[in-house]
Amino acid sequence: MSLKSISAIIGDLAKAQPDWPAISHETMSITRLELHQSTNRLARAYRGLGVQEGDFVTIALPNSIEFYQACIATWKLGATPQPISAKLPRVEQIAIVSLAEPALLVGSGADLALGVQTLPANFMPDPALSDADLPDKVSRFWKAPTSGGSTGRPKIIVSEIPGCFDFSQDKPLQQEFDRAQLVPGPLYHNGPFSFSMNGLFLGNHIVVMTRFDAEQTLALIEAHDIDWMMMVPTMMSRIWKLPDEIRLKYDLSSLRVMLHLAAPCPPWLKEKWIDWLGGDRIHELFGGTEGTGATWITGDEWLAHRGSVGKLLGGAKVKVVNEQGETLPDGEIGEIYLLPPGGQGSTYHYIGAESSGLDGGWESLGDMGYVDSQGYLYLSDRKTDMILAGGANIYPAEIEAAIDTHPLVRSSAVIGLPDDDLGQSVHAIVDAAEALTDEALLQHLTEHLARYKIPRTIERVQTPLRDDAGKTRRSALLKERIAQAKDIN
């Protein structure tokens, strides 16, 4: 078997088992044949609006069957889907659209004057358009997700992997053919997007949730005989905290792989899940959207190497260096650098940012840690100030930039305070005029930031938050507040 385009993969699945379910969402479901035919028609509608091979299509849709249809229609034209949150504020959406320069924007924001062709959510193509197969095309880049970036400005991470795959040789992340996969996370995030699309291409029945709900997740696993799913630790925590009479009443025997990623998992929580489901069913992945390298570890391995995130996959290399860029021996903590098999630039390129790293193409995800003598990687801390809240990457500079746009704000600093549920919660420290109330500031931020980025707590100060060099020492601010909390307790 050789590489096949995404269009051919979807078409072959439809021919093999046309009536099998492809995607389910809430009370709606679509078969493989319906998915293939509807996306042929939708692709023709997109083409009529000017989408061509090599273009980007920005997709601002919530979790839904429609989201998958928009992506597949884009691939069938040889274009690249560029997913974003359907709830992005106008300022953020304009910034991303200006970077991507898409041929088409689908979904939220279609009513804004963004200077690009747009389609609203729930768009239905003309039924007179043909649903026959289109000429086979391969997208040059199969995906282009976004990131806030440590500078506070958005960037687009364009995958260098083309839109064609050969799963006969390598099935990703222990996924199997013709199973069922649950998607509880937002599809504009790289993990849910990539892994659920891989599952779809493998013939999995994709069961996508509108939003995560702890008990509903368990009910869907039982109802659809879910084989594979991924979660972030916040989801795991909320499920574990359900009353036993709820958590234990559902049959989870079909669940073969539960993969967690995107944020550190508290050891106590991981142990509870291993005790509950078994170490052979709990898996962890560490890596970045850039695809420069990833690790994998099973629950059983983790018990033998407690705290590790596993060994490198797929021929990638890892090294740990000190501040001078010198490679450290096993067991010594430093900054973690990864090198993909094809070298720097082989897995992605940025729009809106520049890649950086060490000589030879080694790149860092901003994590500190060490490698043991057996090649297991351990994380100790973040080098940067990025906040990990509920599995989402949140960049303080972006929130500070939004806060500082208010005319009554003098300066601000944003840090991530420890949070039992989310891992970290966004805390804003603000030096502002007394006339500015917290309520007014929060209202201001709703116009500039996605909801999950808005601070959960605000602290008022009357001292400068930047040093003479104009830098904010967030790590020092965080240590002070953690120490204060310990003194109070």
Please tell me what each predicted stretch does:
Residues 2, 21-52, 56-64, 89-94:
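Conserved AMP-binding/adenylate-forming core of the ANL superfamily
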Residues 3, 18-19, 123-146, 153, ...:
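Conserved pre-ATP/AMP-binding loop-to-beta segment of ANL
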Residues 36-41, 142-143, 155-178, 184, ...:
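Conserved structural elements of the adenylate-forming
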Residues 145, 201, 227-228, 244-305, ...:
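Gly/Ser/Thr-rich phosphate-binding loop
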Residues 165-180, 188-227, 242:
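Conserved AMP-binding/adenylation subdomain of ANL enzymes
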Residues 221, 229, 368-453, 465, ...:
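AMP-binding/adenylate-forming catalytic core of the ANL superfamily
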Residues 312-315, 326-358, 392-394:
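Conserved ATP/PPi-binding loop(s) of AMP-dependent carboxylate-activating enzymes
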Residues 317-338, 370-374, 434-438, 472-474:
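Conserved beta-loop-beta connector loops within the AMP-binding
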